[in-house]
Amino acid sequence: MKTKLASLLVVLFISTTTQLSAQRFTVQPVNDDISYYLDLKAVASIFGDSRNLEDFERRLNNDDDQISNLDLNKDGEIDYLRVIETYEKNLHLIVIQAILDRDVYQDVATIV
């Protein structure tokens, strides 16, 4: 029984799920390569600490915190991450997108 409980706790920790005052959310990378260059645990943490989505976006792109090393367009610069709020069926989603060029974006993670 203790082994099952410990395994469950490890799985919950690794999946970057966090509990926030009775609210639960999960940060899901678009693919495994993204999670190598984007600290999903830090993303979940600052999402929980942010006052609103604007504050969350500002914190994601703060040079001092170094949450992201994404350079998806290979221009030698770390890509700016924008935060989009959307609804899909009955789900409220927060989508994190890398800005690659003018009017060119790539989804990198979703917060469910």
Where are the regions that the model predicts?
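Bacterial Sec-dependent N-terminal signal peptides
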Residues: 1-25
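N-terminal low-complexity segments enriched in Gly/Pro/Tyr/Ser
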Residues: 20-112
